[in-house]
Amino acid sequence: MAAAATMAAAARELLLRAGTSDMEEEEGPLGGGPGLQEPLPLGELDISSDEFILDEVDVHIQANLEDELVKEALKTGVDLRHYSKQVELELQQIEQKSIRDYIQESENIASLHNQITACDAVLERMEQMLGAFQSDLSSISSEIRTLQEQSGAMNIRLRNRQAVRGKLGELVDGLIVPSALIMAILEAPVTEPRFLEQLQELDAKAAAVREQEARGTAACADVRGILDRLRVKAVTKIREFILQKIYSFRKPMTNYQIPQTALLKYRFFYQFLLGNERATAKEIRDEYVETLSKIYLSYYRSYLGRLMKVQYEEVAEKDDLMGVEDTAKKGFFSKPSLRSRNTIFTLGTRGSVISPTELEAPILVPHTAQRGEQRYPFEALFRSQHYALLDNSCREYLFICEFFVVSGSAAHDLFHAVMGRTLGMTLKHLESYLTDCYDAIAVFLCIHIVLRFRNIAAKRDVPALDRYWEQVLALLWPRFELILEMNVQSVRSTDPQRLGGLDTRPHYITRRYAEFSSALVSINQTVPNERTMQLLGQLQVEVENFVLRVAAEFSSRKEQLVFLINNYDMMLGVLMERAADDSKEVESFQQLLNARTQEFIEELLSPPFGGLVAFVKEAEALIERGQAERLRGEEARVTQLIRGFGSSWKSSVESLSQDVMRSFTNFRNGTSIIQGALTQLIQLYHRFHRVLSQPQLRALPARAELINIHHLMVELKKHKPNF
């Protein structure tokens, strides 16, 4: 129906537009022709905006033309007027039908209207009820806010009362002295656990009362008298107990570590005295310091005296220096030496004293050693003495810090009050001993013992001995340097002419140096010290100069070289046993040994093969300068060299080998020298062959008598010593 209405409206508009157009064509815009049945009822039509209206009509028509029914009607050529009337008729029928339906449903509509009216009344009453309810809610919300404010105020009052109650409870609990506390302080022995527990309670109550008194609390006066009497009783019992423990240290043969351990269990006793009776605490501390300082001093003085009795009877003296000859001390009234002076400069097993296992080994027991007739070097006694000192000092320092509740400088001062006299006595004894000590190895080992003990003390977190270690090192280092300088001076001032008969074997002074230097180098490698290396460098220079001075006493260069090689080889061998291969001493003597060995080989080859050596050098020089023609005048000389070498080389090599093996004490070194000499001889003969291959000497008849180089090598290998 909507489509039909749309088509009808569109048809009317088209007809209206078409009629208007026809009228305009036939009669003009204002005329009326015979085709016009009646004038258009314009009514109140506003023609002032006809253009705008026509535009709207155009738009409306254009929209209707898009309708499918209109398009279909236009396509089929239906008469629009007739179609419009038909549609209008249908619309009227529909309208009448709708009216009849409305009339038929009028009762229902009236009933619906009544129902709507009733609903409006109900909704109005609901609105009134909701309004009243909203008003009630507003008043309730106000009451709730009032209740919340009242509740908050009550909570604040409750918390305040609880806080006051807690404070008052604490105050009352702190002021009340229970009967259990009184009975424990008055009757219980101090060693019982309940005495310690109630003593802690008494200390807390006394502190609380002092705090409340400072605030002006009047109730403190009620308990002050009771607490004071209990405090006096507790102080008296504690004082007697601690002094009794301290006095027990004085008993002979008492292990004072046991009472110390017992005191640590009751360290709160001293804390109580410190907080409640400082005069008594000071009395106990002073008594402890006085008692323990005497005990330590007596113990270490006795131990040190007994310890020195098990030292070796034979010790180094001022004449036991590196450059002093063995016969210097022998006199008419002198007794024979129980040891060789060379052992003073030898490390041997003495270095084990600084090994980790020996360093912290149990201390020596002098009477046990005396029964077993055992004797020890000074460094072993020094280690035992200072390990005991280290162990007891660490234990004492930790006890002082824990029992007397001190730390930092206060702990240092208290420690030195206890151990100061003992440490001072030990330093004086060491200073006195070092005055007549000439054993550099012993002093150097003592230095390294101190360095290691200092590290142990640092690991145990005991800094109280730091100053003592510095004082000990301040005594040891200068003495060590002095002894080393004395040895340097003794070597420097040694006159080779006063040493007796000359011998190409290693000298005893160089052997002393080798043993001594290797000992110090091996010890110094563990904790390197630059000053030590400088002093050893000075000693090495003097020993090298001494070796050269002694070598100069030999008449022949060959003997000089044999002496130098034997000494350099011996010193190098000893050093390499203990020092690192890349140490300065090893490198220096290796270079000296190589240089003198090469010179000796040339000196060794010179008598039997000197002519051959001279000719080869001269010929090579001529060839290098381009004067090879001058070799033609050397044919007779070359012939003599060829025949002389061929007839005597075997005997010369045999004599050379025997001479070398007789000259050198180190068989391995002698073998190396023979090997080098034979290698150089082969190289020399090979160079001789190259010279004879020059055109100027190639036609020499004597070349036929040359020994084949490979044959010579095979023969020379037979002279290589085998081990």
Swiss-Prot record:
The modification Phosphoserine is found at S355. The modification N-acetylalanine is found at A2. It comes from the Eukaryota. GO terms for biological process: endocytic recycling; Golgi to vacuole transport; lysosomal transport; protein transport; retrograde transport, endosome to Golgi. Its main location: Golgi. Residues 21-41 are annotated as: Disordered. Keywords: Acetylation, Coiled coil, Endosome, Golgi apparatus, Membrane, Phosphoprotein, Protein transport, Transport. Residues 107-127, 194-215 form a coiled coil. It holds the Pfam family Vps52_CC. GO terms for cellular component: cytosol; EARP complex; endosome membrane; GARP complex; recycling endosome. One of its GO terms (molecular function) is syntaxin binding. It is a peripheral membrane protein. The keyword Ribonucleoprotein does not apply. It is found in: Golgi apparatus, trans-Golgi network membrane; Endosome membrane; Recycling endosome. Belongs to the VPS52 family. Acts as a component of the GARP complex that is involved in retrograde transport from early and late endosomes to the trans-Golgi network (TGN). The GARP complex is required for the maintenance of the cycling of mannose 6-phosphate receptors between the TGN and endosomes, this cycling is necessary for proper lysosomal sorting of acid hydrolases such as CTSD. Acts as a component of the EARP complex that is involved in endocytic recycling. The EARP complex associates with Rab4-positive endosomes and promotes recycling of internalized transferrin receptor (TFRC) to the plasma membrane. PANTHER family: SUPPRESSOR OF ACTIN MUTATIONS 2/VACUOLAR PROTEIN SORTING 52 (PTHR14190), VACUOLAR PROTEIN SORTING-ASSOCIATED PROTEIN 52 HOMOLOG (PTHR14190:SF7). This is Vacuolar protein sorting-associated protein 52 homolog. The gene is VPS52.
